Curated annotation (Swiss-Prot):
It is an enzyme of class 2 (transferase). The keyword Ligase does not apply. Keywords: Antibiotic resistance, Cell inner membrane, Cell membrane, Glycosyltransferase, Lipid A biosynthesis, Lipid biosynthesis, Lipid metabolism, Lipopolysaccharide biosynthesis, Membrane, Transferase, Transmembrane, Transmembrane helix. CDD domains: DPM1_like_bac. This is Undecaprenyl-phosphate 4-deoxy-4-formamido-L-arabinose transferase. Its EC number is 2.4.2.53. Belongs to the glycosyltransferase 2 family. It is found in: Cell inner membrane. GO terms for cellular component: plasma membrane.
Amino acid sequence: MSLNEPIKKVSIVIPVYNEQESLPALIDRTTAACKLLTQAYEIILVDDGSSDNSTELLTAAANDPDSHIIAILLNRNYGQHSAIMAGFNQVSGDLIITLDADLQNPPEEIPRLVHVAEEGYDVVGTVRANRQDSLFRKTASRMINMMIQRATGKSMGDYGCMLRAYRRHIVEAMLHCHERSTFIPILANTFARRTTEITVHHAEREFGNSKYSLMRLINLMYDLITCLTTTPLRLLSLVGSAIALLGFTFSVLLVALRLIFGPEWAGGGVFTLFAVLFMFIGAQFVGMGLLGEYIGRIYNDVRARPRYFVQKVVGAEQTENNQDVEK
């Protein structure tokens, strides 16, 4: 594929989960931004098992006769990245842009992403300027970004921002990957030859609350660790060797102290022994837990169950007809 292959159609993929308050503004602003493009476009909204009225709103928008919207309805909540992969499976564009539904990253940035991608980049990432999140979210994101950069060797400043553009061959390569734990920005960068980042505006969340709770962030961290690299397993071996050496050294020291100071001194060191023992046992349990995470991922992949189940697709035929009329 030529690096400067022209972009004839743009697909926007937006995962939606309980975003009924923001959906009207999201649809209006995204459509307005896409109308500024010189290319044909489609807007794919993936309902990730919402429990509010998001499903009804998406269905109504997709059924609009003048709509460029396709609504993909999943039967339950599978997570943000699985929902995006469901959208990827439906796209027909040469350039695919992902966007969150909370409007913290404005859809008005879409034309700029398309313009940068036309310069020949496989992936166009973004960095949130003046990020409007809590200190906890900022700190957690910074730590995750550092961990990803060390594991992948690719220096990108903000892996957590989902406002990104991907060439079609990158999306097709990702669709051939069937692992259950998928982090799309990292997966895309493993296939990309040319990547870049641009700074985008970041607004405060106007509607609802973030769907990433503390437990979801912890789960995301484990997903990243286990799907990126096997380095933690190697580190476990090193840590285990270090603990064994430390334990042997400490045992020799205790024997020497007993010989020097007599059995009375050894009786007073029982609590020290227990403290050291608990430290070693704790380290073993941490290692076993991490090893269990890897085994669990292998088990899920071996079962080869689908990432998601699409209950219904609304508006696909209508969107194709609208594109034909515009041509």
